[in-house]
Structure formats: structure tokens, C-alpha cells
């Protein structure tokens, strides 16, 4: 597997996986995103996203947020370890510039790793 790739194996696609994370996952929140996470039996992290149409009326806005989340995850996947992650967006984040959202995601990845190492 490529060191910083984002293959299909790294995506959460099964609805059962999403249900498990929503039911038993822990969370890290910020002004723009909530990240739910749960450990998996794999050696690599997997990412799922819940970016509702209700928060973004235009597809271009939803896709921009998804691209930012994927890119941030791709760059930080080495430190995230074997966890399943679901990123939920909060309303109003489409007004923030990309740099603010990437910074927010970076802080969340750091907080998630710290929270996992503390427990």
C-alpha cells in the first residue's frame, strides 16, 4: 500500500460499520467538525464522512468539504493507527476558508491521538 495513498480499503463503505461507530464510538468535537472514532482490528485507519445536504444546498460545497477531509486524513493516516473514523460536518462551515478548516481538522487529529493515548 502506498505510504500516503487513499485506497478503497481505507474508506468506510459498509452501513454496518457506520452503525457500530455511531453506537459505540467516542467523539472529538470542534467548531466545524465532530469526529467519531472506534478502534478496528486492522493496522490502518478507515474514513467515513457524513456531510448532510441540509447543511450545504449546493453539491460543490459538499464536495469541497469532502475533498478537504480526505486530504487531511490522507496526510495524517500514519499517526491515526487502526481506527475507524466518521467525520460529521456542522452547519455554517462553508463560510470558512479552506485553510481554517484544514487547521481545524489537524487539531482534531492531534486531539484524537492524544485522547486515545490517555485512555
Curated annotation (Swiss-Prot):
Consists of a catalytic RNA component (M1 or rnpB) and a protein subunit. Its EC number is 3.1.26.5. Belongs to the RnpA family. One of its GO terms (molecular function) is 3'-tRNA processing endoribonuclease activity. Keywords: Endonuclease, Hydrolase, Nuclease, RNA-binding, tRNA processing. It holds the Pfam family Ribonuclease_P. It catalyses: Endonucleolytic cleavage of RNA, removing 5'-extranucleotides from tRNA precursor. NCBIfam families: rnpA. InterPro entries: Ribosomal_Su5_D2-typ_SF, Ribsml_uS5_D2-typ_fold_subgr, RNase_P, RNase_P_CS. The lineage of its organism: Bacteria, Pseudomonadati, Pseudomonadota, Gammaproteobacteria, Chromatiales. GO terms for cellular component: ribonuclease P complex. This is Ribonuclease P protein component. It comes from Nitrosococcus oceani (strain ATCC 19707 / BCRC 17464 / JCM 30415 / NCIMB 11848 / C-107). One of its GO terms (biological process) is tRNA 5'-leader removal. It comes from the Bacteria. The gene is rnpA.
